[in-house]
A protein has these predicted regions:
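Short acidic/polar hinge/loop motifs at secondary-structure boundaries
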Residues: 196-223
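Periplasmic-side early beta-strands and strand-to-turn transitions of outer-membrane beta-barrels
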Residues: 227-228, 240, 248-256, 268-349
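Outer-membrane beta-barrel signature, preferentially recognizing the C-terminal barrel domain
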Residues: 345-360, 396-405, 448-456, 502-517, ...
């Protein structure tokens, strides 16, 4: 008994001695907030409570938060962010000198997710008065497709020139179209990676394979004219890839091997050391490909169209206090392609560097700055193939050097909780040329060098108002584009030049692109939207100064092209029912494009058939979009989308030796597109995803003489986690083995088809540290 009393007395004394020191002790509480993919979540609200003490901060651009002098050793933090389910976490100092917390916020209902592409600032999807599709990291992982452009094909209204894909098609066939605006090599939608342009500034096409899949946190697709914020190229919308930012040591790898001898490796790794963060991403791909000409038309010159590419991306960032970050990024990309015959090949080498700043000033202002530069070399060989396809002769060796510099700055100011003001500017200058060695019957006859420089400077502003059940966005942008130092110089080698050398005069033009968008919520589950806008696209240097040949068709450049001008409107309804388990959206859209740049047939009877890039007159695209998703439970999801587009030529001035195109359907635009997906995603049991895609009839040419028939394909992926960090899977694309037509081009005896791929299957594994939480 006496021993117990002694122990008790000593305990009271010890507590009495230490109490003053504990009461005066302060604790440092810090941490980071990220989503399940590992991407940091900026501007999340963090509220710390400990007894009567309370403090609040927002996470910085790097997802970090910090409380320096907390007068307690335990408490809670409440973390919330629009688009995510809130989290409360307990903390205790214990024996450490500070508290470090790692918080993961899981996305909330689909209507509460956040998009940045629609307004150049974060807006809840339920408050976005526009047609936006969000693909999460889970959506990308669940897609059986191997290449990122094939992932986007599940978005109704998204298409590439000539139904091509990046596995085997020439880079110049990778122009993006949204909402039936028609396709050429140049994109009519802007493609970004973390705010930096992915579109080739010289040609307008996209090198999709520059984006390692393992680095993706999400993908956003905004459909509808967006030149009001993004300028040229955003005629039909914006596609943006959002990559992961490191918060703690992490590593992700996906590797697979498939038929056609197709190995692939994609990985991302990142870490944070003090105020520094570092990430490295890379992807390597190769395929032996397939013969793109049908068996009935093949000759001895037809060989598999194949490709190989590699990309590496290194980013270093440094945190500036609690609310800022600077970074530098460097990337390198290389590819080689065989385009279906021994002579016809192309290869690309590209290096890019970028620096950026994200800085918050107080609670109401932020500044974003980006600058980048790119150097590219593109080689291409063209040939003339004999009618029996048993021989070919070299016709053209092209080399395209390209240099690009650009920058952008954006200021954002929050006027309380209900209004956001945005102002900014961006500048891009590209210098490029097409240096050609031309051949006739195997003889080198002349050299031709054509090219120039293009500079586009834009200023934009936006007022975003959210009041009660209304969201109103009023935005506008002025662009000034200039072409200068342009020329076409011919040097004879054998014989004479068919056209004289020309020094083109400098040209300039202005464009104003306004947009008014309104959303009205009719209760918690229904909203209606409407938008009116204008947009534009300046012709690329490729369209102005570079010619190209495909099979028996020679398409000439046109140095006198005008900018495309679009006027559009849309109206839609959004429904969310069954406690957000069912989300539906329908949108009607209407667009008129004046002076669209199209490949117009000028002499169909010649050999090769002659086409030239022309300002067609006016085309009109109108239609409806439907998107829906059913969340049966946490593991099962069913989604579908449908797009109906009627795109026709409504005004046309017939040039000499050409035929009238008035009333024709716009080339490369299918009238009907339907996609669907059913997914069961439970890593502890099975990962199963089935997708289907129907593409309707379309035409390959402006005269509507060469149709491309409808087709339906299905893809499948099945997998399972065999440990917390390791997943094995098998995937197959085109499991119905539908050999659909990709191209239909005229020949002297009829037409030549190119066909899509056969069944493509692969097996692989995904390795993630820490483990992914879907």
């Amino acid at each position: 008994m006496q021993n117990r009393q002694t122990i008790f007395i000593w305990a009271i004394c010890l507590w009495t001695v230490t109490l003053p020191s504990l009461s005066g002790q302060t604790t440092q509480v810090e941490g980071s907030v990220r989503d399940p993919s590992g991407a940091v979540i900026a501007n999340a609200s963090v509220v710390l409570n400990s007894g009567s003490y309370q403090a609040a901060v927002n996470t910085g651009a790097d997802g970090h938060f910090l409380f320096l002098t907390v007068p307690s050793i335990s408490g809670t933090v409440d973390i919330s962010r629009e688009g995510f389910n809130p989290v409360r976490q307990w903390w205790n100092l214990g024996s450490a000198t500070s508290v470090r917390l790692e918080i993961v916020l899981h996305p909330g209902a689909a209507s509460e997710q956040v998009t940045v592409s629609a307004a150049r600032t974060e807006v809840r999807l339920s408050e976005t008065p526009g047609s936006t599709i969000l693909l999460s990291g889970k959506d990308v992982a669940a897609t059986p497709a191997l290449r990122v452009d094939d992932v986007l094909r599940q978005v109704p209204g998204f298409s590439l020139f000539r139904r091509s894909d990046s596995r085997t098609a020439n880079a110049s066939n990778q122009g993006v179209s949204l909402r039936g605006l028609g396709g050429t090599a140049a994109s009519r939608a802007l493609v970004l990676e973390d705010g930096l342009p992915l579109i080739d500034a010289f040609g307008g096409w996209v090198y999709w394979d520059r984006v390692p899949r393992a680095s993706l946190a999400s993908v956003e697709v905004f459909r509808g004219g967006a030149s009001n914020l993004y300028g040229s190229d955003a005629l039909g919308g914006v596609v943006q890839f959002i990559t992961r930012q490191p918060e703690r040591p992490a590593f992700s790898l996906e590797t697979s091997y498939g038929n056609e001898r197709t190995p692939d490796l994609s990985f991302w790794t990142g870490t944070r050391i003090g105020h520094w963060d570092l990430s490295l991403a890379s992807e390597m791909f190769r395929t032996d490909g397939y013969i793109i000409v049908p068996t009935s038309q093949r000759g001895t010159v037809d060989t598999p169209a194949n490709s190989k590419d590699a990309t590496v991306d290194l980013t270093v960032g440094h945190r500036l206090g609690e609310k800022g970050r600077v970074f530098a990024r460097g990337s390198f990309y290389t590819e080689f392609r065989n385009n279906g015959t021994p002579v016809q090949t192309n290869d690309t080498r590209m290096g890019e560097g970028a620096v950026g700043l994200d800085q918050q000033f107080g609670s109401a202002d932020s500044l974003t700055f980006r600058a980048h530069g790119l150097v590219l070399g593109y080689d291409q060989r063209f040939s003339s193939v004999a009618a029996n396809r048993n021989s070919e002769s070299l016709t053209d060796i092209q080399y395209v050097p390209e240099q690009v510099v650009g920058g952008a700055a954006q200021w954002t100011h929050f006027l309380g909780k209900h209004q956001t003001l945005i102002a900014g500017m961006d500048l891009m200058e590209v210098m490029g040329a097409s240096d050609e060695q031309l051949f006739l019957s195997g003889t080198h006859t002349r050299n031709n060098a054509a090219g120039g420089r293009q500079r586009i400077l834009g200023w934009f502003g936006e007022d975003l108002i959210r009041w009660n059940s209304w969201t109103i966005i009023l935005a506008g942008r002025f662009d000034d584009w200039n072409n200068f130092n342009a020329s076409s110089i011919c040097t004879p080698v054998f014989g004479t030049c068919t056209s004289p050398s020309v020094l083109y005069p400098s040209r300039s033009d202005l464009a104003f692109s306004p947009r008014l968008s309104v959303l009205r919520s009719l209760g918690r589950n229904v909203s209606v939207t409407g938008s009116m806008y204008r947009a534009f696209r300046a012709p690329t240097l490729n369209e102005l100064y570079r010619s190209f040949r495909l099979a028996n068709v020679l398409t000439l450049n046109n140095p006198f092209l005008n900018a495309e001008r679009l006027t559009g409107a849309e109206a839609g309804v959004n429904l969310s029912m069954l406690q957000h388990k069912l989300d539906l959206r329908g949108t009607f859209f209407w667009s008129d494009i004046v002076d669209p740049v199209e490949n117009v047939t000028t002499d169909p009877s010649s050999s090769p058939v002659l086409r030239q890039k022309e300002n067609l007159g006016r085309i009109r695209s109108r239609g409806v979009e439907f998107d829906g998703v059913v969340h049966v439970n946490r593991d099962i999801q069913i989604s579908a989308g449908y797009d109906f587009t009627a795109a026709t030529v409504v005004a046309y001035t017939v040039p000499p030796e050409a035929v009238s195109l008035l009333g024709n359907k716009v080339a490369q635009v299918p009238q009907n597109v339907f996609t669907w997906e059913a997914r069961y995603w439970n890593p502890s049991r099975i990962l199963l995803s089935v997708q289907g895609r129907f593409i309707g009839n379309q035409f390959d040419d402006d005269q509507n003489l060469y149709p491309l028939g409808r087709f339906y394909t299905m893809d499948l992926q099945i997998g399972r986690n065999i440990s917390r960090n390791l997943e094995v899977f098998a995937a197959a694309e085109n499991i119905l083995d539908e050999r659909y037509k990709v191209a239909n081009t005229p020949t002297a005896s009829g037409s030549l088809f190119n066909i899509g791929p056969p069944v493509l299957y692969r097996v692989g594994l995904r390795l993630n540290f820490p483990s992914e939480k879907y």
